[in-house]
Amino acid sequence: MAEKEKTYVQDVDRSLYDFRNEEKDAYRVKSGLTSDIVEKISEEKNDPEWMRIFRHKALETYNKMEIPDWGPSIDELDMDNIVTYVRPNTHMSAKWSEVPEDIKDTFEKLGIPQAERKSLAGVGAQYDSELVYHNVREEVAAQGVIYSDLEGAMRGEYGEQYAEMIRTHFMKLVTPGDHKFAALHGAVWSGGSFVYVPKGVSVEIPLQSYFRLNAPGAGQFEHTLIIVDEGASLHFIEGCSAPKYNVANLHAGCVELFVGKNAKLRYSTIENWSKNMYNLNTKRAQIAEGGVMEWVSGSFGSHVSYLYPMTVLKGDNS
């Protein structure tokens, strides 16, 4: 029998992603992880009291847990050298023209505004620890679809019913006790998107959030929470990248997806990380009776990747 020809996979061309901007952040916490740092992040985020308490309890859990030993070694990752919150020198806007030129240039090089115009129902763009742009098409919003920054929704800025949804669902699928970096996420999370698709609504074109980590030696801890109600459907796309530095960067995002009865959700991810990145990501979906969940994931680069996806088939025929 003839020997099968071997196929070799070369490194992905990262020239599109390795450009970097001069650091112009408005505020950053000190490196490391302490109760004071967690409190400062909570103040910066204007958290409701329940979230402030949640963060500190997550920090307590983090301090009690060991580094996971079920994957590649991450012994070289030193949290004392990681900056867990970096606020860019801007605010979130629904108008692309209001985004600062240097940040706008970053996302334009990545093709985000072009993609929004051509084929997306809405876009969120996060730069370091904060969303800088978030917008959804009027016809999608008219269907009752909520696509917003998670923090604003948590504070009730889009309606108290959505604030209550977040309090009911936040880190209930991925709990701080799952593993050490889930606890870390619970303590210092910042940014991310909230999506609610009402009963029976079909979002015909995708929503997308893109996360760009620019600051060297920093971490990014966005949280994505999606609720697709009974009989509804959605395709959500997530993109992530960062330039290459000579110091470690950390990405420990979290995704929680709730798919209702006879609902359908497709979650697509493309991550292209530099070789100095520790990518420690946890994603989980819970599917009700007759619901359908589709994961499409492509993760490239990084120094170490822990990707921890899970689907909980809670209902019959899911």
Which residue stretches match the model-derived regions?
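A composition-driven signal for long, intrinsically disordered, charge-rich low-complexity tracts
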Residues: M1, Y62-M65, F300, T311-L313
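Conserved beta-strand/loop scaffold segments within soluble protein domains that form the structured core
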Residues: Y133-N135, E139, Q143-Y147, E151-S318
